[in-house]
Amino acid sequence: DHDVILLQVPLFWYSTPSILKEWQDLVLEHGFAYGAGGDKLEGKRLMLAITAAGPDDAYTSGGYQHYPLRDFLRPLEQTARLCGMHFSAPYALYGTLRAPAAGEVDPHVEGYPALLEAIRDDRFDWDTAEQRDVLGYDSLPIGKEG
């Protein structure tokens, strides 16, 4: 019995890979995830760890993707809401095509276990995360152990 579903996916053609859509079709059934009796996910949290090939400035109204990354995740956000879940800002690594040369992979990789540990240890500030558009290794809302 867990409270958080964390999906780790790349952004493919402005969406998630088809295997995730298949998982949604098989698991998120009426009577389980939504609809009459479909309360098994109610109150749980959905978060994505996502990679995008383009740099962060590409995902702006003036960038070549024309929209923020979060806009491409709206179907997942709405799915979470339909299932009674809370949708958190994604943990994102932009510019994966240049990230290794730019030295951005190591901090992101180090931030990921910090994120997981904070979730496990109940130190992750979900309220703050739900208000943000995107989370990065340098902007994780992690509190002190309490």
Regions found by a protein language model. Name each.
Residues 79-146:
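Glycine-rich phosphate/pyrophosphate-binding loop and the adjoining helix
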